[in-house]
């Protein structure tokens, strides 16, 4: 079962595999047909959450969900327009030898603001980058409508990923999540597709007779410490 309940909305996790390789995962769910009519697709060094078939592009529902760089080993994941800004900011910090402080995550999420929908869906984001001595650094953040963004540096144990979701999990009455409401999943696999499948399978839920799962994405950094293996599972 999903640790955030049957309806997490959008959800992301960052952490490490059992052999201490950085890992990320991202889940998209939707109660309405429009929310479910999209899929994850690879594009250059990233994954987009886009339309199915010839449906028009909708900037609220369609976005870059994952962006990574196989030179620096950085990966960013989020539920909207903030993904590329977060990726480029932490890539710049890495390239200039600056520390990857959480302040940058908070400022970028504050700039993105909550989504302009009826629920004021929070913005969530995660980054896996490198700090001093090329050690991995993991940061999560959430921005709610009525409060400043809050970010955390996560120090996961091997085989554990820490995550955050947009909603608290109630399928009938979704509520924006709190930034302190972090959750964890255990992962014993070794590949990106195993991680994507694992998150997809534990998140099965039905609303008005329809499976709410849209897609799940998994990413694991190789032992060379900079190359990402990324895979996806669509409904």
Predicted regions mapped to residue ranges:
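Conserved short alpha-helical segments that host acidic/polar catalytic motifs at enzyme active sites
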Residues: 1-235
